[in-house]
């Protein structure tokens, strides 16, 4: 794989951005998160950039306005939470400024590396599941992280570039991320960007991503990948014969959904068990989380209820888990900020699609797919996903030509 643009610094920026967003060894390490943000600020100050973009100011003003209104409404405010949010936002912004129009290229290259590593480790585990226990035993204790689950502290070991996560009934590829569904989501996003860039659904890089997506056994990732492929074929310049295959894909997808246990059965069980999940563990499924979030949304649909558990969660659900990122985001920030946030996503995606000549419907498809992915993961509060708010800044003055394509070459 040729690295024709940039050097080790740029790849480390992207890797650590993914790290603080979803790789537990980094995302659970508060001192590292702060040092990484300060490092980006320092690099920015040493660079040739002369000003802060107005987009960052718009976002910060909107955030502070929402927080002020919520603090007054609920008579509650915790400054450290807001400082953490601002840190994540500025981390995203400075990463975008330093990586520029090649942000997506660096993302794809790092994801290719992480995907290959994940498959090298996962395949032996899949063949012989006990190999995972061997890796855990061999991993030194300092390569570990802690998180809270239902009020209890949980310790996990990690190889950093592969998270040693154990599940009872299935062997799934979670890559370096906090769980397989999260890895699946990042892989689908990488697949989407690479498809638009290469203008083909089944290039060698995309085949690699598809294999890894299959290995995650993530229902949501499967549905998102299938939905994007169908939409891409429909909206791009494919023949009527190819577009007619959408019907075949649709029938095949429906059959798979009905017959493969971890697809249809998993979702049906979650729907049926949503009420019990709420009562027993405070919403530890996407449907139970959506129901709880909907109760919050109905009370404050426009302003949201804020980042603080004290303004969101009934005491009976003190250790509630809200893992439906879509409804959780609306419940937290309200409908008005929801549209503000994703307006910037749409602008950035539109610029990316313009550069590579994609249909003007594709940015909408990208947005819908990301919403679908978020139904099972809380993505939007992380620095990597905040970066999509600012992705249009370096892209708006870029025009497609052969020189850009050569510099952006992944092969």
Spans of model-derived segments:
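Long extracytoplasmic/lumenal interhelical loops at the membrane interface
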Residues: 262-333
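Helix-loop-helix junctions and helix-breaking kinks within/between transmembrane helices
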Residues: 24-35, 70-87, 175-185, 203-233, ...
């Amino acid at each position: 794989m040729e690295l024709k643009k940039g050097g080790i610094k740029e790849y480390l920026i992207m890797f650590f951005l993914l790290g603080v967003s979803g790789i537990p060894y980094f995302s659970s390490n508060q001192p590292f998160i702060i040092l990484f943000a300060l490092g980006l600020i320092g690099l920015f100050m040493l660079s040739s950039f002369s000003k802060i973009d107005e987009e960052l100011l718009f976002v910060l003003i909107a955030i502070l306005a929402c927080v002020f209104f919520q603090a007054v409404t609920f008579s509650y405010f915790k400054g450290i939470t807001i400082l953490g949010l601002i840190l994540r936002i500025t981390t995203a912004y400075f990463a975008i400024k330093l990586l520029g129009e090649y942000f997506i290229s660096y993302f794809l290259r790092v994801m290719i590396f992480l995907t290959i590593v994940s498959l090298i480790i996962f395949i032996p585990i899949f063949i012989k599941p006990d190999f995972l226990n061997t890796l855990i035993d061999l991993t030194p204790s300092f390569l570990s992280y802690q998180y809270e689950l239902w009020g209890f502290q949980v310790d996990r070991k990690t190889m950093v570039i592969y998270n040693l996560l154990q599940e009872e009934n299935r062997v799934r590829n979670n890559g370096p991320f906090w769980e397989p569904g999260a890895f699946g989501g990042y892989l689908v996003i990488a697949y989407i960007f690479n498809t638009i860039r290469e203008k083909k659904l089944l290039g060698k890089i995309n085949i690699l991503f598809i294999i890894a997506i299959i290995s995650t056994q993530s229902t949501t990732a499967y549905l998102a990948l299938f939905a994007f492929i169908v939409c891409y074929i429909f909206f791009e310049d494919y023949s009527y014969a190819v577009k007619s295959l959408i019907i075949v894909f649709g029938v095949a997808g429906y059959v798979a959904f009905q017959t493969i246990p971890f697809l249809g059965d998993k979702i049906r069980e979650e729907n049926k068990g949503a009420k019990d999940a709420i009562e027993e563990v405070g919403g530890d499924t996407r449907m139970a989380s959506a129901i709880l979030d909907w109760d919050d949304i109905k009370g404050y649909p426009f302003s949201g209820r804020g980042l603080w558990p004290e303004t969101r969660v009934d005491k009976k659900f003190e250790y509630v888990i809200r893992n439906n990122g879509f409804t959780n985001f609306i419940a937290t920030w309200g409908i008005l900020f929801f549209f503000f946030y994703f307006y910037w996503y749409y602008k950035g995606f539109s610029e990316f699609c313009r550069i590579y000549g994609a249909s003007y419907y594709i940015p909408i498809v990208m947005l819908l797919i990301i919403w679908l992915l978020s139904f099972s993961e809380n993505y939007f509060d992380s620095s990597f996903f905040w970066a999509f708010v600012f992705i249009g800044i370096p892209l708006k003055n870029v025009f497609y030509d052969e020189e850009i394509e050569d510099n952006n070459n992944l092969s």
